[in-house]
């Protein structure tokens, strides 16, 4: 493989990641024939087929999978070298790849903004996705850091909690229960509920709480986004359990109200996660340190609701449950 080039590897990495020569060409601002030529030359240098086409889909061969894994490691090391040199020169610059669960979008931008002002040489790539999408990104090692409330089981990962994530009951301000205090779970179980999709940490925590009291949730609808759930609440379809962060700052909606229910809020935390043993880049390590410090500023700005339950076991922080 003496004749391969970094440019060929860059083209191959994009084609493998997208499973498409066309999308790779679009990303790299190249023509599709150019991508095909670069991959063909790389294939010749390797001496084994890198792709196989079945129907209209493009798949990596075993040689292609091994090369893709190695190629990503090569580019990660080159990025790390750039950051290390910049750090030695007294500068912080480079690329931060950050992936977060959808609910984190209500507070993460408030952290990224000041971070970028402090370190103008750092560019941030932020991906927002649901729980399943984030797990896939962790599995594929696509990012530097991941932010979610429920770290997955079955992964060898480093987990760093940094901010409380209380889950609260939300409903229309006009609802008959809106101004009541100490609403029982038994009474709440009579109401229709709108929940996040299956696999969501918020949904699982809610189902666990009701199951612990031998109560069934009346699930009227499940939706894949917090904003869709808010609109469904306003449409009179039911109540919901949401992260308190969705009701603060940019997520605030005057027509919605947090209900005072026994057993709520459910105590969870936000976690920064990355593969165990992974050497964080200078930029990623800088952001993680910043996250642990500045998250306390956000916590101070948010008045976290107190639990209304008299059961100390329910009032205690709940353990993180795996996927």
Curated annotation (Swiss-Prot):
CDD domains: PBP2_CbbR_RubisCO_like (cd08419). It is found in: Cytoplasm. GO terms for molecular function: DNA-binding transcription factor activity; transcription cis-regulatory region binding. Residues 304-323 are annotated as: Disordered. It comes from the Bacteria. SUPFAM superfamilies: Periplasmic binding protein-like II, Winged helix' DNA-binding domain. Keywords: Activator, Cytoplasm, DNA-binding, Transcription, Transcription regulation. Residues 21-40 bind DNA. The keyword Transcription applies. It holds the Pfam family HTH_1. Residues 4-61 form the HTH lysR-type domain. InterPro entries: LysR_subst-bd, Tscrpt_reg_HTH_LysR, WH-like_DNA-bd_sf, WH_DNA-bd_sf. One of its GO terms (cellular component) is cytoplasm. Activates transcription of the cmpABCD operon under carbon dioxide-limited conditions. Belongs to the LysR transcriptional regulatory family. This is HTH-type transcriptional activator CmpR. The gene is cmpR.
């Amino acid at each position: 493989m003496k004749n391969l080039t970094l440019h060929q590897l860059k083209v191959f990495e994009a084609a493998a990641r997208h499973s498409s020569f066309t999308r790779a060409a679009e990303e790299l601002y190249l023509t599709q024939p150019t991508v095909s030529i670069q991959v063909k030359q790389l294939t010749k240098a390797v001496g084994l087929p890198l792709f196989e086409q079945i129907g209209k889909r493009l798949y990596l061969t075993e040689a292609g999978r091994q090369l893709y894994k190695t190629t990503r490691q090569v580019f990660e090391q080159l990025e790390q070298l750039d950051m290390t040199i910049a750090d030695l020169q007294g500068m912080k610059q480079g690329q931060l790849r950050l992936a977060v669960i959808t609910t984190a979008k209500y507070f993460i931008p408030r952290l990224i903004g000041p971070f970028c002002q402090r370190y103008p040489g750092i560019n941030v790539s932020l991906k927002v996705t649901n729980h399943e999408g984030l797990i896939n990104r962790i599995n594929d090692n696509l990012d530097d850091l991941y932010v979610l409330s429920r770290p997955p089981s079955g992964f060898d990962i480093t987990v760093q909690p940094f901010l409380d994530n209380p889950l609260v009951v939300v409903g229309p301000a006009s609802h008959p229960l809106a101004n009541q205090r100490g609403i029982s779970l038994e009474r709440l179980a009579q109401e229709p509920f709108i929940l996040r999709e299956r696999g969501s940490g918020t949904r699982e925590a809610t189902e666990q709480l009701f199951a612990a009291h031998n109560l069934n949730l009346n699930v009227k609808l499940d939706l894949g986004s917090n904003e869709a759930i808010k609109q469904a609440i306003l449409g009179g379809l039911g109540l919901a359990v949401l992260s308190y962060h969705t009701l603060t700052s940019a997520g605030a909606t005057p027509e919605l109200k947090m209900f005072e229910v026994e057993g709520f809020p459910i105590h969870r935390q936000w976690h920064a996660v990355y593969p165990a043993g992974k050497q964080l880049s200078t930029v990623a390590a800088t952001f993680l340190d910043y996250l642990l410090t500045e998250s306390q500023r956000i916590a101070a700005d948010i008045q976290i609701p107190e639990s209304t339950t008299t059961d100390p076991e329910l009032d205690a922080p709940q353990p993180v449950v795996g996927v």
